[in-house]
Amino acid sequence: MGYLSTDKKKITAITLRQMKEAGEKIAQITAYDFTTAKIFDEAGIDSILIGDSASNVMCGNDNTLPITIEEMIYHAKAVAKACTHAFVVCDMPFGSYQVNSDEGVRNAIRIMKESGVDAVKLEGGSEVVATVKAIIAAGIPVVGHLGLTPQSVHKYGGYGLRAKNEAEATKLLNDAKLLDEAGVCALVLEKVPQALATEVSKQIKTPTIGIGAGSGTDGQVLVYADAMGMTQGFKPKFLRQFANIRKCMTDGIGDYMKCVKAQTFPNNEESY
């Protein structure tokens, strides 16, 4: 299998900060396998996230909680191999950093060593700042995540809009400042009001990457299966479908089946 080569320079944590300073928006997308990541990397995507959304997209689970660190490393290793340009981030799965900072550091080191990614991402604000600092002190870039934090879905009773009232908005802003001071290289803001996400982005030096957070963040991220039209029935307000890969694949597999059953594939030119 051959691929086009890319001469684009490797994006790093420092590059992301420079992009924010220059006013250049950051485009991030998820990927979970080598082939998909290679396509995105060659297209010039700025960053690829191996999200724990792999639990839903790749494993068919109802939420992100079941996926293990071994499964995350498996997917992350494949994606990292594919990327020569994109900044590659791996989610730390539920249970890999919540117990204490020492365990968080050990698992972050394991992910970096075994997968070859550029950074790890974990959810939470003030409650994880000590762990974030410890991981960064170990030499590992960290991406933060505030707002809708899917690993806490049971705590909040669903996937609704976060920081809707003044108290929640104040806490989110304060948490963002704490993570900024701790040294995160980027901060995901998920499903929060646009005005709040814009204000957070203005008040911190860290690049913000939004999903359902409006246009005022320093970048955007989407789950690729949703953005490329591969999933059905999931149509939140923030989602735009940029392709209809599901239809392409359905049409393609239909044509393949017809040709096999009609005995028109393979033909003589396709046989040895």
Language model features with spans:
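Alpha/beta enzyme core
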Residues: 2-272
